[in-house]
From Swiss-Prot:
This is Methionine import ATP-binding protein MetN. It catalyses: L-methionine(out) + ATP + H2O = L-methionine(in) + ADP + phosphate + H(+); D-methionine(out) + ATP + H2O = D-methionine(in) + ADP + phosphate + H(+). It comes from the Bacteria. Part of the ABC transporter complex MetNIQ involved in methionine import. Responsible for energy coupling to the transport system. SMART domains: AAA, NIL. Its EC number is 7.4.2.11. It is found in: Cell membrane. The lineage of its organism: Bacteria, Bacillati, Bacillota, Bacilli, Lactobacillales. The gene is metN.
Amino acid sequence: MSKEPIIKLDNIDVTFHQKKREINAVKDVTIHINQGDIYGIVGYSGAGKSTLVRVINLLQEPSAGKITIDDQVIYDNKVTLTSTQLREQRREIGMIFQHFNLMSQLTAEQNVAFALKHSGLSKEAKAAKVAKLLELVGLSDRAQNYPSQLSGGQKQRVAIARALANDPKILISDESTSALDPKTTKQILALLQDLNKKLGLTIVLITHEMQIVKDIANRVAVMQNGKLIEEGSVLDIFSHPRESLTQDFIKIATGIDEAMLKIEQQEVVKNLPVGSKLVQLKYAGHSTDEPLLNQIYKEFEVTANILYGNIEILDGIPVGEMVVILSGDEEKLRQACQAITDSQVQLTLLKEGGKA
């Protein structure tokens, strides 16, 4: 994957004026997105994420900042392109939305073809391209169907095909799976991941669900109240979230909070004996391959009772989390915990035996 940024947003501000009020929707945000990334931008409603991505193709003009797309500066405290150049630039960027925005009176085939209206292609070339795009999104057999005859997932596939009609280098997905059921969401995410690999497509994914980012993105930015509060690789953010909002998103995505509620109700945890510790272990990469709990038993005679375990694959790297009760001699227990930490496993003490 190339390390060259295809999208550079530098010190972006977006300010709206409403009834003598000034609303700072985006505040001094800098984000660089590399060619071929699937880049997730996460935040709750009102965080500014959708406003931010709309500046990428200048559907929303910033109040200040600099925008560079594929090495071309398109905004530097003012629009630097002519209207013709801007139209050409926008052809490089496709968009899909939560609501599919298909024309109800047109078939799937005609909806995709509509995006080629000003392409300059012959009628035959357009037909061939539309057929290829529908095949790419797995809808060849639905070409003649109208939107009312399609499921939500199929409508989104038509919208994706239409967004790809002008061979964009960038695809912006703004909450594109929010209206879909979980199974269909996974199918659409798998399609986006496939398009990223097949076409080298850079995808900017706007969502309020960290689960979606976890499933397909390789980098993530977290926004709150118009500000960028955390940014990095998905692996780093999931392994070492700094901000409380990010931690909350990750807890929801991994299900650890729900698991902890059940763990805390177990008698063995309620009545944790002296000489035992309830700990949470987080580990990534090579450390998931080490039989660590077996080693600490052999070396320190410390036993481990596993109450919860989960392994995810994030950007191709295994990341795990466990909640265990470690039991043994006090000094041996201290040494075992140190050995775990020395093995690049993050250890958090949740409860100590004999204490409330």
